[in-house]
């Protein structure tokens, strides 16, 4: 019988997800600084906590912390999926697809519940695409790290 957390998969998922969250954060911040997008990761992360992210250093720090927490949560979910459901074959592709699944959930089904600003969701192709690509990168990075942390492995007991 497979059991989750036999080999520390929970905490490894937390670590992988938080680190991959930093990768996603960096990607979205770069796009925002370059003027490709209007909204940065703080806008999406803080949308879960409050209706609108206020300007300032405090909001930036809180947004970064929220990104780590959200990344850690999804990292545990992805770790669980790879431990119980998916095989190790093509783990990067599967991680990418799981990231796209997160995008569909967060910005399709739960966008209103998370309080994302309408102008973010209607901000044009660049905005929506950058969020999609950011979460695809997040999923791939999480899978990559889970492989390095030996959560994703060829044989299961």
Indicate where each model-derived feature is located.
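Juxtamembrane/disordered regions of integral membrane proteins
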Residues: 1-157
């Amino acid at each position: 019988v497979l059991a989750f957390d036999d080999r520390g998969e929970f905490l490894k998922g937390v670590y992988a997800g938080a680190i991959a969250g930093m990768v996603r954060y960096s990607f979205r911040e770069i796009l925002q600084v370059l003027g490709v997008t209007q909204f940065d990761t703080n806008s999406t992360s803080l949308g879960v906590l409050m209706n609108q992210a206020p300007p300032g250093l405090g909001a930036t720090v809180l947004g970064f912390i929220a990104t780590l927490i959200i990344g850690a949560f999804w990292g545990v979910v992805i770790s669980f999926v790879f431990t119980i459901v998916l095989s190790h074959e093509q783990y990067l592709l599967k991680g990418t697809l799981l990231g796209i699944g997160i995008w569909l959930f967060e910005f399709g089904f739960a966008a209103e519940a998370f309080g994302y600003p309408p102008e973010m969701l209607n901000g044009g192709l660049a905005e929506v695409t950058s969020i999609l690509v950011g979460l695809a990168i997040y999923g791939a990075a999480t899978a990559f790290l889970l492989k390095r942390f030996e959560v994703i492995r060829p044989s299961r007991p």
